[in-house]
UniProtKB/Swiss-Prot annotation:
Organism this protein belongs to: Aspergillus niger
Protein name: Pectin lyase A
Catalytic activity: Eliminative cleavage of (1->4)-alpha-D-galacturonan methyl ester to give oligosaccharides with 4-deoxy-6-O-methyl-alpha-D-galact-4-enuronosyl groups at their non-reducing ends
Main location per the UniProt record: secreted
Entry's transmembrane regions: none
Localization annotation: Secreted
Pfam families: Pectate_lyase_4
Listed GO biological process terms: cell wall organization; polysaccharide catabolic process
Effect upon mutating E32K: In strain: 4M-147
Protein's UniProt keywords contain Lyase: yes
Keywords assigned: Carbohydrate metabolism, Cell wall biogenesis/degradation, Disulfide bond, Glycoprotein, Lyase, Polysaccharide degradation, Secreted, Signal
Residues the record marks as carrying a glycan: T88, N129, S368
Signal peptide coordinates: 1-20
């Protein structure tokens, strides 16, 4: 009886601990309603092979990372000839000649020798109905990114870090890739030292996506601007994409933070853009951006290319138009030692009607809140 009682008590403690593991909070914005792996029993991968298997199988899963999974040298290296479109100084990124990119797009760039890790070039496939969460500040994937593609849906990634993917090499790999997917919530994720894009949404529809409370850390020894500021931040290049960006910390970048085009509707709200040496936004043809309640601090150029449409709430009075489409007024953005933008296109705001819309708070409280809460370990 005594042993039975002890066993029962231990089992109860374990069950309570397991029940406590799961996603924190719920998605806001376009991906509202995503459930990921739901109430599936959590699994704890121990090896990189186990992690790849769990992420790519057909089961609904809650996958908990308790350590760093280092893929860096897991697939060997490739040596070859690339090119140096941005110069040959030690702080400049160089390009892998992927699909003859150097010949086709940079034929005048000097040739250089390259040696990169194969694991970084293509991310781990994440299939439908998955929650990938980190425990505390310890869950990380190093040397390889994540790919949510080919019809995958209902996925949550929360409280992890994705880092160190061939940082010297353009075309060396992306941190998080979405293409042809739906209902994806990425929250409290830190990305750092990435070869190409921290986030890239490809040319197929990515439907409902929420990127919230993430830390895009652009500090790097190598960059396309040769100044330690990473150029390739966030690239939203989809087809009928709906993207919410809220509460993110975009730091120390020099461009594409974000680049938006090709029939993408972006709601960019309450983000903190800090120390950007080049430009934050590029809005290409087919990019539709509502930007409200954001803070731009030490951003040289807030908007560079402008070929799409944007409403950036140029005044409090102007923000009243949003009540017709969002059910509330939009709030103005804040700027400090920074360029500004004051785009006033409202023709696309009707596209927000009937959709799940993130709330917005005044920009005055955004910077301190985002710095304290964004990224891994800040749930």
């Amino acid at each position: 009886m005594k042993y039975s009682t002890i066993f029962s008590a231990a089992a109860a403690v374990f069950a309570g601990s397991a029940a406590a593991v799961g996603v924190s909070g719920s998605a806001e914005g376009f991906a509202e309603g995503v459930t990921g792996g739901g109430d599936a029993t959590p699994v704890y991968p121990d090896t990189i092979d186990e992690l790849v298997s769990y992420l790519g199988d057909d089961e609904a899963r809650v996958i908990v990372l308790t350590k760093t999974f280092d893929f860096t040298d897991s697939e060997g290296t490739t040596t070859g000839t690339g090119c140096a479109p941005w110069g040959t100084a030690s702080a400049c990124q160089v390009a892998i000649d992927q699909d003859d990119w150097c010949e086709n797009y940079e034929p005048d760039a000097p040739s250089v020798s390259v040696e990169y890790y194969n694991a970084g070039v293509l991310g781990i496939t994440v299939t439908s109905n998955k929650s990938l969460i980190g425990e505390g500040s310890s869950g990380a994937i190093k040397g390889k990114g994540l790919r949510i593609v080919s019809g995958a849906e209902n996925i949550i990634i929360q409280n992890i870090a994705v880092t160190d993917i061939n940082p010297k090499y353009v075309w060396g790999g992306d941190a998080i890739t979405l293409d042809d997917c739906d209902l994806v919530w990425i929250d409290h994720v830190t990305t750092a030292r990435i070869g190409r894009q921290h986030y890239v949404l490809g040319t197929s529809a990515d439907n409902r996506v929420s990127l919230t409370n993430n830390y895009i850390d652009g500090v790097s020894d190598y960059s396309a601007t040769c100044d330690g500021y990473h150029y390739w931040g966030i690239y939203l290049d989809g087809d009928a994409d709906l993207v919410t960006m809220k509460g993110n910390y975009i730091y120390h970048t020099s461009g594409r933070s974000p680049k938006v085009q090709d029939n993408t509707l972006l709601h960019c709200v309450n983000n903190y853009f800090y120390d950007i040496s080049g430009h934050a936004f590029e809005i290409g043809e087919g990019g539709y951006v509502l930007a409200e309640g954001n803070v731009f601090q030490n951003v040289d150029t807030v908007l560079e290319t402008y070929e799409g449409a944007a409403f950036t709430v140029p005044s409090t009075t102007a923000g009243e138009v949003c009540s017709t489409y969002l059910g509330r007024d939009c709030v103005i953005n804040g700027f400090g030692c920074s360029g500004t933008f004051s785009e006033d296109s409202t023709s696309f705001l009707s596209d927000f009607e009937g959709k799940n819309i993130a709330s917005a708070s005044a920009y005055t409280s955004v910077a301190s809140r985002v710095v304290a809460n964004a990224g891994q370990g800040n749930l």
